[in-house]
């Protein structure tokens, strides 16, 4: 099965299934000398792990990461870093009823048609469970970028279903299970998700992820533009159906004289492009937004077919998120960090000796 690696010089490869023994990752390309402990990774894993609130899946996994290689005496050695998280709370019996049927809206049908066989327990490899390793790997990238450049990567939820957050206070984001910066929106989010669970359905979400203090010059035109690789990384996250960079789809209704991000000797006058021009970072804050679809794992009966191609009904059991966007923020942060780390190394490899004609202008 191909497609389990991302990045060129900073390369992350993951493996593992929802109800298997555990999850693993190999993170290659980490420069030597970075002080790194399991606790550095655990902070973000704890933000993503299931069972932490009544608004997410009640599967309880400690997601305790183990560093099994690539770190010696508390520092990275420059060799591949091996990471392991063991699964502890699988309930495979919950999925016996779908062994012969396909859950509509899931990867069951396509995995079976592509591979001729599938692990039906919790979705197997297609489960969002695999994103735990992305978060662990992304935490390494976040730490390196923060220490070397002061890069700050952080995200927040802007919409749950039809409820929209109207303001952003970063101090509020870690204080609620929705990663929302609008304290007034949180009760509305809570009421909506509670109602959806009672109704046996689910809803989508929208998140914004920012990367501040990214140096100018990262990105490899034309096919590996920074925004192209960011979009690729974000679209690889389960349930993501749309990605916006900067003003995103709103540009269709804008005018050039309003949105060309004019610049002066003192800095840029706007950031409609989201910190990327011509596929290269401009030094401004990189702004990314993603939209996640409602999970199809709901307790409302639906129509499907079985392995004999016979019509049947299906009722999804198991422990699922009524809104997958609730826990997606640290995942999206991790994917942005992985892409930025890769592009830093690629830029350094080719352009380390380049002397720009003048110092970068201020964002």
Curated annotation (Swiss-Prot):
Gene3D superfamilies: Chorismate synthase AroC. Reduced FMN (FMNH(2)). FMN binds at residues 125-127, 238-239, 278, 293-297, 319. The keyword NADP applies. This reaction introduces a second double bond into the aromatic ring system. The gene is aroC. GO terms for molecular function: chorismate synthase activity; FMN binding. Keywords: Amino-acid biosynthesis, Aromatic amino acid biosynthesis, FAD, Flavoprotein, FMN, Lyase, NADP. Its cofactor is FMNH2. It is an enzyme of class 4 (lyase). It catalyses: 5-O-(1-carboxyvinyl)-3-phosphoshikimate = chorismate + phosphate. It comes from Acinetobacter baumannii (strain AYE). Pfam families: Chorismate_synt. Pathway: Metabolic intermediate biosynthesis; chorismate biosynthesis; chorismate from D-erythrose 4-phosphate and phosphoenolpyruvate: step 7/7. Belongs to the chorismate synthase family. Its EC number is 4.2.3.5. GO terms for cellular component: cytosol. GO terms for biological process: amino acid biosynthetic process; aromatic amino acid family biosynthetic process; chorismate biosynthetic process. The keyword Flavoprotein applies. Homotetramer. NADP(+) binds at residue 48. This is Chorismate synthase. It comes from the Bacteria.
